[in-house]
Design a protein with these regions (language model features):
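Alpha-helical scaffold segments that flank or form the walls of functional sites
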Residues: 17-29, 35-88, 113-142
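Active-site gating/metal-coordination segments in enzymes
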Residues: 80-84, 88-90, 94-177, 228, ...
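Divalent metal-coordination and catalytic microenvironments
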Residues: 23, 63, 95, 171, ...
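Catalytic pocket-lining loop regions of alpha/beta-barrel enzymes
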Residues: 168, 172-246, 250, 260
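Short acidic/histidine-rich active-site segments
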Residues: 178-179, 232-234, 256-278
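Histidine/acidic-residue-rich catalytic or RNA/ligand-binding cores of hydrolases
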Residues: 30-34, 75, 101, 188-194, ...
Length: 325
């Protein structure tokens, strides 16, 4: 089968993505995250369309959204945003960190096979219009194109192992790539071991937030497994030396830039200019692009990180349709 990326509006060739942010939050439509942090409310499509438009004027072509099942995901709003702006949006299935659900959430009552079946249904049949908030499920035409997982700080919890096992099974059945959350950047090696032991293709895994750990050896070890490292902390360093830039310099010296993708993980109103925040969705294409240039990381490097690498990482893996979960 020809390689493809599954967007919320349909399948496209990987080369059609263009400049891609690998971990974003364009829509957070209520749910426990907003209950915990009102600043997470990103339910206004009009506002986000304006924000997206400004970034697209600088060349943005695609975004991988990272809000999975029943924690503010809205396939309908993501699809509306994509139609209105022309931005390619990859919608997620999966489960976030446990704190975004609580102890009584339905995800605690499902086993590996049941969770895998739910993820596969999102990918192959369509995402529930009600985002599994219950009691009814009404599948939309908008399908998930990536599996998002949240891991605990340091090491995987028992729940994490269950969810990672389900994600591995869903990957084997569909070929969908996996995007993980590494709490404070930690635990990446254990996450990789869990996924690879479950039969996941390493080239179709991206570990998010790992640039929070500015350790050259850690990043070498992660890259050696074959997975991608998603750096999204570039605007969070304040007056300190920019650790994301330092890591990019090391990865360039070690000839490992093919293992890096970039995002912003902008999950708060305070990060978007339409809400009076900063630095805005344009950051990777203006402020950070300039900072990279000043460090000798020019247009060729930016193309690898923002175009070539995500097109490869988020393309569906070839699978054997005869395998079982």
């Amino acid at each position: 089968m020809t390689a493809f990326v599954r967007t919320v509006l349909g399948d496209i060739e990987p080369s059609a993505l263009g400049v891609t942010y690998a971990h974003e939050h364009l829509v957070i439509d209520g749910g426990r995250p907003v209950e915990l942090e009102p600043d997470f409310d990103l339910s206004n499509v009009d506002a986000m369309a304006t924000e997206v438009g400004a970034a697209m004027e600088l060349g943005l072509g695609a975004v991988v959204d990272a809000m999975p099942c029943d924690c503010g995901r809205s396939a309908l709003k993501l699809a509306e945003l994509s139609r209105r702006t022309g931005l390619h949006i990859v919608a997620p299935t999966g489960l976030h960190h446990d704190r975004f659900y609580g102890p009584s959430h339905w995800s605690h009552r499902l086993n590996v096979e049941q969770l895998a079946n739910l993820f596969v249904a999102d990918i192959e049949d369509g995402i529930d219009a009600y985002d599994y908030s219950g009691p009814f499920v009404e599948r939309t035409q908008h399908r998930a194109g990536v599996i998002k997982l949240g891991g605990s700080e340091g090491s995987l919890s028992d729940r994490d192992h269950l969810v990672f096992g389900a994600a591995a099974a869903a990957h084997r059945r569909t070929g969908a790539s996996i995007l993980t959350h590494c709490e404070r950047g930690t635990g990446g090696l254990e996450q990789v071991r869990s996924l690879l032991d479950g039969g996941v293709t390493p080239e179709h895994v991206a570990l998010s937030h790992v640039d929070k750990v500015v350790d050259r050896g850690y990043h070498r070890e992660l890259a050696a497994t074959g997975v991608a490292l998603e750096y999204d902390g570039s605007f969070r360093w304040g007056d300190a030396d920019n650790g994301t830039l330092r890591l990019l310099g090391w990865m360039a010296e070690d000839d490992l830039l093919d293992h890096v993708v970039l995002g912003m993980d902008a999950a708060r109103q305070g990060y978007y200019t339409v809400y009076g925040g900063a630095p805005g969705l344009t950051w990777l294409l203006d402020g950070f692009a300039t900072a990279m240039e000043d460090r000798g990381l020019g247009a060729d490097v930016r193309r690898r990180l923002l175009v070539d690498n995500p097109a490869r990482v988020f393309a569906f893996a070839s699978i054997d349709r005869g395998i079982s979960a």
